[in-house]
């Protein structure tokens, strides 16, 4: 599901909200999460998962054009760890669909909403 598809699914699910408001809400949430991670904060969404930063160590890489070895510097990268409820929900949905779980027939937004309703 892309960001545009998420916005469209939310707008369809909540017709009382203007599409531009849904678009603004999703973009604002993603911007806030990006800013929090960029400032080194950890984000925890109970029942869904957590976002944090992981440190990648410097390493020796290879320039694909010249074959020359180059030093690739260390860097911070975002990391997502799914929460227990999300893992269980995904496993449950995957088992219900059998081998056809990649056909896109399920409604991912509905799955998230159902998971949230379990609280």
UniProtKB/Swiss-Prot annotation:
Signal peptide range: none
Keyword field: DNA recombination, DNA-binding, Transcription, Transcription regulation, Translation regulation
A Pfam family assignment: Bac_DNA_binding
Renumbered residue ranges of the record's region Disordered: 91-119
Biased composition (Low complexity): 94-107
Superkingdom assignment: Bacteria
Similarity section: Belongs to the bacterial histone-like protein family.
Quaternary data: Heterodimer of an alpha and a beta chain.
Stated name of the protein: Integration host factor subunit beta
Chain's gene name: ihfB
